[in-house]
Design a protein with these regions (language model features):
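Conserved beta-strand hairpin/beta-sheet module of binuclear metal-dependent hydrolase folds
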Residues: 2-52, 149-164
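Active-site HxH/HxHxD metal-binding segment of metal-dependent hydrolases
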Residues: 19-21, 40-131
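Metallo-beta-lactamase
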Residues: 33-35, 40-42, 101-103, 107-110, ...
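Histidine-centered divalent metal-coordination motifs
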Residues: 63-69, 143, 147, 199, ...
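Aromatic/hydrophobic pocket-lining residues that form the small-molecule binding cavity
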Residues: 70, 180, 184, 257
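C-terminal regulatory/interaction regions
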Residues: 226-287
Length: 287
């Protein structure tokens, strides 16, 4: 797949500890323009997208249903009449494990656009074509069950699977660490020339970055096991033992730790003292 379509970006004015400099809304092509991630519901941001596209938006693509990516869809779709493409609704694409946890009432929900629905659902490998670009949908769950990346020639728009400035939040039941590793492996096997993350600058050396992220998660799992050697604890307890970060970031760290614990439980390395919930106490298996 070789595609030299023009790529432009409009940075949303939503910087934060979780979004970095803000959400990147990408515009692909010139004669017919595809917008990847309209971003937050910010009128000035949507106007900036419309101005840059010069009235030629034909497709609206959404990597996943978090408010900083999908909340602007309705405003942009109303202005352009362009169809909206995504994997599915906000709760779509969950692994069987995460679907079962959601049914028990386990809540993640950070920034989820619960009412999001695309006009057209995409599946892994499907292609969208225009007169000057071809985009292939890649199902890349991990950060969220219905997360899509989009392949344009030797470039991949990777949403929040890979960030240009930090690691991604994995918050069950939306996020799944097992899926995350599989998705990193998928991108590595595709060997893109460049990754365009939804937050941060383009990644010109994708393979080292993908390897770095996988190694970081493996190290975090090892740290959690070491922390459990000191005694059982909840995800919050373990996060406090492991992380040295500002207090306002600790809730996200606790969700990441829970994701690791669930993956370690699948491997038989840890066990909880009851049904999975946010305040479940965990210990080393057999301990």
């Amino acid at each position: 797949m070789n595609d030299a379509a023009k790529v432009r970006v409009v940075l949303a004015p939503n910087p934060s500890a979780m979004t970095g400099p803000g959400t990147n809304s990408f515009l692909i092509g010139e004669r017919e323009v595809a917008v990847i991630d309209p971003g937050p519901d910010d009128p000035a941001h949507i106007d900036a997208i419309l101005e840059l596209a010069e009235g030629r938006i034909s497709h609206i693509l959404v990597t996943h249903a978090h408010l900083d990516h999908s909340a602007g869809v309705a405003r942009l779709a109303q202005a352009t009449r362009a169809p909206v493409f995504a994997f599915g609704a906000a709760d779509s694409g969950r692994s069987p494990t995460m679907a079962r946890l959601a049914e028990t009432g386990l809540v993640g929900g950070e920034g989820v656009d619960a009412g999001f629905r695309p006009d057209i659902e995409l599946r892994h490998g499907e292609e969208l074509r225009s007169s000057d670009w071809t985009l292939q949908a890649l199902h890349t769950p991990g950060h969220m069950g219905g997360h899509l990346s989009f392949r344009l020639g030797d470039a991949i728009f990777c949403g929040d699977l890979v960030m240009g400035w930090s690691t991604s939040l994995i918050s069950p039941p939306e996020g799944d660490l097992v899926d995350y590793f599989r998705s990193l492996d998928l991108l590595a096997r595709l060997a893109p020339r460049v990754l365009y993350p939804a937050h941060g600058e383009p990644i010109a050396a994708p393979l080292p970055r993908l390897e770095e992220l996988a190694a970081h998660r493996r190290l975090r799992s090892a740290q959690i096991l070491a922390a459990l050697d000191a005694g059982p604890g909840t995800a919050a307890d373990l996060a406090a033992r492991i992380y040295t970060i500002p207090a306002h970031l600790m809730p996200a760290a606790e969700r990441n730790v829970l994701a690791h614990l669930l993956a370690l439980a699948d491997l038989g390395a840890v066990a909880g003292n009851g049904p999975v919930r946010a305040d479940l106490r965990w210990q080393r298996a057999g301990g």
